[in-house]
Each structure stands twice: as structure tokens, then as C-alpha cells.
Amino acid sequence: MFLTRSEYDRGVSTFSPEGRLFQVEYSLEAIKLGSTAIGIATKEGVVLGVEKRATSPLLESDSIEKIVEIDRHIGCAMSGLTADARSMIEHARTAAVTHNLYYDEDINVESLTQSVCDLALRFGEGASGEERLMSRPFGVALLIAGHDADDGYQLFHAEPSGTFYRYNAKAIGSGSEGAQAELLNEWHSSLTLKEAELLVLKILKQVMEEKLDENNAQLSCITKQDGFKIYDNEKTAELIKELKEKEAAESPEEADVEMS
């Protein structure tokens, strides 16, 4: 006798007769409510950009942390439940440090992503010999970007289901559908790092409800020379200004209307 739909909903490790895990599907839906995050990989580096939503005018935008460093050569952007992201990021940092201590080398990007996705599967009752870590799947997705000697610049999308894929360009969050369509049109293999920075800002501007500025958007990049770095507000403001000038040069009529 089959269980009811509500009973399958509550069972995080029980498949429905259709072969579905509803709690995992719900966790994927939670990500669609999160702020938009975009990653673009180029031959010069990887760029990450996120929308910083302020739920109150009294909220300090600097306290909204959507892009974080995992190691000197790896960083990530998140969309979904920030509290869940903290657990995944701490696990990733521990994995990176442990690998460095044991092997005296930096962990490669794919191995670290695999470690994070292994953690994402540790929910429910737990397998034999494994500790149950969580009562439900994580409600967050990560864009993990980095550089290593084996595979160069890489961008991975890690889901709450434990699935991960490598992308040249990827968008997650509430504006991901429109952003991904724009990435399909705009991305090409010869993109420079500067072009990728401006493309991320351009797409964020299109999908965000608020006017784009240095307080509600954040950028970071990873290069072989400088490692991972998050741009400060001044650097972000300069890039936004450069984007506006570029758009004005391409379509002066629209720029005149916007200025008026």
C-alpha cells in the first residue's frame, strides 16, 4: 500500500512511486527565491557577481555576504538560505586546509566541489556507519570558481541534491532563467576578464528589480596571479560607470531618454 503525498513530503529519504524525492525538489525551489548569482569563466580568470538584496533601508549592505573565499585560489557565490551556505562553506574550507596539510599542495577545484556535494547528501536517516548530519536537504546552491594547475580556470554549479556540473557560464537564483538566456547569447570562448565583468553587471542590471549600484551588487574574480579577491565598492562603482558609458556609446538615444 502506497503512502499518501503528505507522507512522502515528510520523508526526506523515501522515494515516491514516481521515483521522486519531494524534499530535494523543494530545496531546489527554495533556490529560485534567492538572490541572483552569476559566474563566467574566461581564459584570463573567473568572474562571480551577485545581487545583494537589502530587506530594510536600515540594513547595512556591507553585512550582506553572498560571495566568500574558500581558499586563496577558490571562491564561491551563493543563492538560497545563507545559514545553510555557511555549513557548506565551512566544510569546504576544512577540506581545503586538510588537503594542504596532508599533501602540501592546494586542493583542486573539482575535488573540493565533490567534497561539498558529498556533504549535501548527508541528510535523512544516514547510511550504515555514517552519522546523520541534517534532518533535511540544504536549501542553497553554490557557484564554485577557482584555478588549479591541472585544469586551469573552472566554474562549478553545486546543487542541494549533491549534483554538480562544470560550466563556462552559469546563473542561479530568482533571475536565473533570464540571466541564463542572456549568457547563452553573450558568452564566447574569447571573452576577456574585463568583458566578463561588464557582462555580469549588464545581466544583473537586467534581472534586478532595483537600480544597479555598488551597494546592491558585488563582484569578485579569480586569477592565477592574484588568486581570489572581492571587489570593494569603489571598484564596483567604477565598473558600473564604465558599463553605463559603454551602453551610452552603443545606443545614444536610449541614454538620452534615461538621462532625461
From Swiss-Prot:
The modification Phosphothreonine is found at residue 55. PROSITE patterns: PROTEASOME_ALPHA_1, PROTEASOME_ALPHA_2. One of its GO terms (cellular component) is proteasome storage granule. The modification Phosphoserine is found at residues 56, 251. It holds the Pfam family Proteasome. GO terms for biological process: proteasomal ubiquitin-independent protein catabolic process; proteasome-mediated ubiquitin-dependent protein catabolic process. The 26S proteasome consists of a 20S proteasome core and two 19S regulatory subunits. The 20S proteasome core is composed of 28 subunits that are arranged in four stacked rings, resulting in a barrel-shaped structure. The two end rings are each formed by seven alpha subunits, and the two central rings are each formed by seven beta subunits. The catalytic chamber with the active sites is on the inside of the barrel. The proteasome degrades poly-ubiquitinated proteins in the cytoplasm and in the nucleus. It is essential for the regulated turnover of proteins and for the removal of misfolded proteins. The proteasome is a multicatalytic proteinase complex that is characterized by its ability to cleave peptides with Arg, Phe, Tyr, Leu, and Glu adjacent to the leaving group at neutral or slightly basic pH. It has an ATP-dependent proteolytic activity. Belongs to the peptidase T1A family. NCBIfam families: PRK03996.1. Present with 17100 molecules/cell in log phase SD medium. PANTHER family: PROTEASOME SUBUNIT ALPHA/BETA. This is Proteasome subunit alpha type-5. It comes from Saccharomyces cerevisiae (strain ATCC 204508 / S288c). The lineage of its organism: Eukaryota, Fungi, Dikarya, Ascomycota, Saccharomycotina.
